[in-house]
Amino acid sequence: IQCVQKQLGISFAEMVELAKASTYTRIFDVNAARFSAPQDMRAEIKAALAETGEAPATDADLINSIYHSLAYCYGEAFRELETLIGQHWDKLYIAGGGAKNATLNELTAHYTGKQVVALPIEATAIGNLKIQMSIPEGGTV
């Protein structure tokens, strides 16, 4: 999402507003190798979507597809994790900058079937600091 945001030259808040205006919800595999470092992320995503059906017609459609695809991927990963370790959770905690994206959090709740709890953006730094403070001097994690 950051690559597309930079390519478009708009804020994340503007991206959310564009996504809300779109009804295009096609999903692509966000973990596909082709998305690791393409020359043009927008073009690569559009090409991937065109290969499996209809490509997004607008930037709003592209952004909405990205959000749906990320949330779908989170759902797949969460279900796989639950299966692998034999545990079930009702909540998914989101920390860091992404926690501010209410639209992505709503989609994540939809695709995971979990309650999404958005932690304050500072939670990532606080958790990191807590871990570092618990390591004895000269020790390792």
Label the model's feature ranges:
Residues 1-91, 100-122, 130-140:
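Active-site core segments that coordinate phosphate-bearing ligands/cofactors
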Residues 126:
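A domain-level signal for the structural core that forms small-molecule/cofactor-binding pockets
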Residues 97:
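Glycine- and other small-residue-rich loops at beta-strand/loop junctions that grip anionic moieties
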